[in-house]
């Protein structure tokens, strides 16, 4: 059992016998009212999203999820097929099931992901916190602009855009932090 104040992004709770992923949790305490937790939840089985406000003392059921290592095997339209690295079983997910990691999923990637199962059904995939991707396009460096941390837009092979350091060029391998939508960490070593 969890209480409302223990909710944080990534936590999975049970509501009406379905697993719900906490995507956002905002704790609020005012002088007059009791503490509350405003949450954005996603049903892991149906993809339905909702917002619910919990009291800090509300009791919520935990969900036991199984996790296995998996790699992306191939992409066919909006269907992504992942392979369990231990027994080579194939599992399919739609693009909407993995929309939070979709900007960093690309054909031929070798990253080992964490496949998340609820009652033997694949419900989502989590990427490692740091991944390496190649810059497909970026503008040239701005000469003389060295007053601070200078960033410029760049595009990855799958079309994802993010800000990178000014010295990054086309073809460079960069590290990306996949938490909170993804951000540039540095040049890959």
Curated annotation (Swiss-Prot):
One of its GO terms (cellular component) is cytoplasm. Pathway: Protein biosynthesis; polypeptide chain elongation. Its main location: cytoplasm. Keywords: Cytoplasm, Elongation factor, Protein biosynthesis. It comes from the Bacteria. SMART domains: EFP, Elong-fact-P_C. It holds the Pfam family EFP. It is found in: Cytoplasm. GO terms for biological process: peptide biosynthetic process. GO terms for molecular function: translation elongation factor activity. Belongs to the elongation factor P family. Involved in peptide bond synthesis. Stimulates efficient translation and peptide-bond synthesis on native or reconstituted 70S ribosomes in vitro. Probably functions indirectly by altering the affinity of the ribosome for aminoacyl-tRNA, thus increasing their reactivity as acceptors for peptidyl transferase. PANTHER family: ELONGATION FACTOR P (PTHR30053), ELONGATION FACTOR P (EF-P) FAMILY PROTEIN (PTHR30053:SF12). This is Elongation factor P.
């Amino acid at each position: 059992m969890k209480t409302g104040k223990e909710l944080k992004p990534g936590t999975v709770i049970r509501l009406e016998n379905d697993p719900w992923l906490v995507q956002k949790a905002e704790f609020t305490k005012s002088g007059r009212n009791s503490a509350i937790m405003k949450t954005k939840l996603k049903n892991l089985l149906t993809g339905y999203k909702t917002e619910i406000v919990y009291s800090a003392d509300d009791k919520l059921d935990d969900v036991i999820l199984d996790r296995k290592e998996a790699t992306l095997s191939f992409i066919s339209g909006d269907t992504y097929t992942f392979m369990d690295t231990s027994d080579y079983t194939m599992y399919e997910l739609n693009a909407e099931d993995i929309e939070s990691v979709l900007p960093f999923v690309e054909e031929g990637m070798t990253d080992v992901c964490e496949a998340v199962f609820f009652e033997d059904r694949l419900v989502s995939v989590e990427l490692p916190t740091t991944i390496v991707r190649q810059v497909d396009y970026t503008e040239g460096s701005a000469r003389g602009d060295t007053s601070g941390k200078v960033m410029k837009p760049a595009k990855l092979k799958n079309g994802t855009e993010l800000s990178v350091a000014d010295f990054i060029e086309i073809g460079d391998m960069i590290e990306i932090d996949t938490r909170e939508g993804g951000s540039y960490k540095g040049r890959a070593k």
